[in-house]
Amino acid sequence: DVESRGLGDVYKRQMRLENLIKDTQDEMYKKIKEGRDMEDAEAKKVADVVAISALKYGDLSNQASKDYVFDIDRFTSFEGDTGPYILYTIVRIKSILNKYKEQGGDLTAVKLQQPGNASEKELAMELAQFNTMIATAGEELAPHKVCAYIYDLANAFNHFYHETKILGEENEERKQGLVALLVLTRDILETCIDMLGFEAPEKM
């Protein structure tokens, strides 16, 4: 009958989803173990968290009205427009902030300053677009716009990271300004991934 056919379809879809999650978790575990010195249990825990980000980001980064092909290699890549790339960026920022605290720095005392170099200005400009992006994405019910924004923000941060001496900055006031920029970037990225329904691990 129609009801049993409907339940059968639901069951099949659920099984496909469970298999998809399992396959993605296995792929993430393999990639994490290949590139990092991490205990098996910790690698499994991190892989499970990152796999959810890979699936959710991969799905939500596409417009709801458009079909897409699931590509496990692309979705689980640590490079490009993917969930793992976003999470890796967040973990990188957290690592720098933890080192700053270990050196005696106080994250609550840092203040934003006028941007210095070009990559710093680029990052500040991306951060300044957050409120407008959230308003637009909310009005249009368009999570793909949140994904596009955090991808651009992650790119801007990583460019800034490679161009700028942060913890090695000798001018203490400027160092605090750079750290404040990192705090704001972390907070906005974490706010956005929370909206998208996933979280970042403490390390990757």
Predicted regions and their residues:
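N-terminal low-complexity segments that are often proline-rich with Ser/Thr-Pro
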Residues: D1-E3
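Non-catalytic interaction-recognition regions
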Residues: R5, D9-M204
